[in-house]
Design a protein with these regions (language model features):
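Accessory RNA 3′-end/elbow-binding domains used by RNA modification enzymes
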Residues: 3-5, 23, 57, 63, ...
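RNA pseudouridine synthases
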Residues: 1-163, 229-230, 237-239
Length: 248
């Protein structure tokens, strides 16, 4: 059902997990119209089937409604917790819990193809977006219902499917470490800057220091090229967002 990019963090790089969790994700998904299930995908129990009579114009209009910031109710079959219990565990016991709508942002929603009652969509979205729920909501808005029948994550943060390594290939490799990426690659969207020896010393001590740079977020490196930290500059002063150097 679900395949695609899954970055794995090891060693000191685990300090970057919190940034990855907030990164945008891109998916390609298949939406099956005319079928609704309790899990909002084709693995669940069918709730109803309806005839599909959706015109291209209707589809275009409905998809437009789901672009930008939207409100989404998390599905019961999810790992979210209510009073310490996962919603999916409650759902398996036949219990329903009221869930409050949450804002999510759909940066891109593109119809890639349509074959019969199956739509193939590309979705670029914010953290916390449930693609299953998006599919179900689109189906409901079209008046015929719908559920997700396939999902592939094609990009997670700065990492794309083209860079991904199949698990079996990784397990069988005699030198799996060759597939490792430096943690600073996840911040390549930010400009990099080399620190002076004195600035590096202050950085390693956790102190802020003056820099002749405009405000913003930066990748900071030592003179030898070691990635030291993700940093922010405000009013000509650089300070640490998160350090990545090894502590001696």
């Amino acid at each position: 059902m679900a395949t695609g990019v899954l970055p794995v963090f090891v060693g000191r790089a685990t300090r970057g997990v919190e940034f990855f969790e907030h990164a945008e994700k891109t998916y390609e998904t298949e939406l099956l119209l005319g079928v609704a299930t309790d899990t909002e995908d084709t693995t669940g129990t069918v709730l109803f089937r309806r005839e599909v009579s959706v015109t291209p114009g209707q589809l275009t209009a409905v998809l437009e409604r789901f672009r930008g910031e939207i409100m989404q109710i998390p599905p019961m079959y999810s790992a979210l917790k209510v009073n310490g219990q996962k919603l999916c565990d409650l759902a398996r016991k036949g219990r329903q819990v009221e869930r409050q709508p949450r804002p999510v942002t759909i940066h891109e929603l593109t119809l890639l193809s349509r074959e019969g009652d199956t739509l193939r969509l590309r979705v670029r979205c914010s953290k916390g977006t449930y693609i299953r729920t998006l599919c179900a909501d689109i189906g409901e808005a079209l008046g015929c219902g719908g559920c997700m029948q396939a999902l592939r994550r094609t990009q997670a943060g700065e990492y794309t499917i083209a860079e991904a390594v199949p698990l079996q290939q990784l397990l069988e490799s005699p030198e799996p470490e060759t597939y490792l990426r430096d943690v600073d690659t996840m911040f390549r969207g930010y400009p990099g800057v080399k620190l002076t020896a004195n600035q590096e010393k202050r950085c390693r001590n956790g102190n802020a220091f003056s820099v002749p740079l405009p405000g913003g977020t930066y990748r900071a490196y030592s003179q030898s090229g070691e990635f030291l930290m993700l940093a922010k500059v405000e009013d000509g002063v650089m300070s640490t967002i998160k350090s990545f150097f090894d502590v001696q």
